[in-house]
Amino acid sequence: MSDRPTARRWGKCGPLCTRENIMVAFKGVWTQAFWKAVTAEFLAMLIFVLLSLGSTINWGGTEKPLPVDMVLISLCFGLSIATMVQCFGHISGGHINPAVTVAMVCTRKISIAKSVFYIAAQCLGAIIGAGILYLVTPPSVVGGLGVTMVHGNLTAGHGLLVELIITFQLVFTIFASCDSKRTDVTGSIALAIGFSVAIGHLFAINYTGASMNPARSFGPAVIMGNWENHWIYWVGPIIGAVLAGGLYEYVFCPDVEFKRRFKEAFSKAAQQTKGSYMEVEDNRSQVETDDLILKPGVVHVIDVDRGEEKKGKDQSGEVLSSV
């Protein structure tokens, strides 16, 4: 077979797919600090899932289940994430959530290459954390192992919207609390994020299980093999996170450099639009002038002897207008 089709296929992207360009795209990946950050995300997610999912175990078993303690679960999730952010924030940024990582990519805070490793580490940590919890919990009380599920009286669309909303408030809290441009933040950033997670749980546990974190739902789903409506816990949180990050970073509190670039782009576009508008107006004015010059007037029939216009009928019987 000829190598020509292969050459054609790679001809245009060949210069971009060189070893040097690939190394530039993954710049910073091959450093010790990078792998420390990835390991931190893995370990933080493992501990977070293990501790927080443990609060969902119903120790009454299937025969005599205890009432669900929403406050206990909410506080455990909130304080767990606050602790992990405080411990690992200076190492990896303390994302501990694929939705947060995607929002950071969309706001140009981390590279795509770094985000791929972060999300992989987070998902792997969630699986291992859920697996450890499954191993140390008596089979009679394992139950669903904290698998997130949409309430039976709600549709998938309702669940998607709830996850979008609670993740939006979480990620908006993260961006607002971690904004380096602010000088009024004096409290604990980790605690603010933890409270945001707790509030989301207090509101949405009965609706969707209050995930706000695709990896948190992914871990127990893998261990228990339960994938019912699992896509909701990826699509909803990611959309909510991207909306929150984009609104905060580009609308409410844009940085000085972004505002300068936006003004330049807007001014340039306005000038181009104004020039096109003036050109169209000039053409229209010329056409209207030509119409005034070339348009024939109305012929009037006037009786000079009587000094008045004739009103009557011509030979064809049509009325001659004096207007």
UniProtKB/Swiss-Prot annotation:
The chain crosses the membrane at residues 37-57, 70-89, 116-136, 156-176, 185-205, 232-252. Glycans are attached at residues 153, 206. The keyword Repeat applies. GO terms for cellular component: astrocyte end-foot; basolateral plasma membrane; cytoplasm; endosome membrane; external side of plasma membrane; extracellular region; plasma membrane; sarcolemma. Detected in skeletal muscle. Detected in stomach, along the glandular base region of the fundic gland (at protein level). Detected in brain, lung and skeletal muscle, and at much lower levels in heart and ovary. It holds the Pfam family MIP. Residues 94-101, 209-222 dip into the membrane without crossing it. The modification Phosphoserine is found at residues 111, 180, 276, 285, 321. It is a multi-pass membrane protein. It is found in: Cell membrane; Basolateral cell membrane; Endosome membrane; Cell membrane, Sarcolemma. It comes from the Eukaryota. It catalyses: H2O(in) = H2O(out). InterPro entries: Aquaporin-like, Aquaporin_transptr, MIP, MIP_CS. Residues 58-69, 137-155, 206-208, 223-231 are extracellular. PROSITE patterns: MIP (PS00221). The modification Phosphothreonine is found at residue 289. One of its GO terms (molecular function) is water channel activity. One of its GO terms (biological process) is water transport. Residues 1-36, 90-93, 102-115, 177-184, 253-323 are cytoplasmic. Keywords: Cell membrane, Cell projection, Disease variant, Endosome, Glycoprotein, Lipoprotein, Membrane, Palmitate, Phosphoprotein, Repeat, Transmembrane, Transmembrane helix, Transport. Its main location: membrane. Phosphorylation by PKC at Ser-180 reduces conductance by 50%. Phosphorylation by PKG at Ser-111 in response to glutamate increases conductance by 40%. Belongs to the MIP/aquaporin (TC 1.A.8) family. Forms a water-specific channel. Plays an important role in brain water homeostasis. It is involved in glymphatic solute transport and is required for a normal rate of water exchange across the blood brain interface. Required for normal levels of cerebrospinal fluid influx into the brain cortex and parenchyma along paravascular spaces that surround penetrating arteries, and for normal drainage of interstitial fluid along paravenous drainage pathways. Aquaporins contain two tandem repeats each containing three membrane-spanning domains and a pore-forming loop with the signature motif Asn-Pro-Ala (NPA). This is Aquaporin-4. It comes from Homo sapiens.
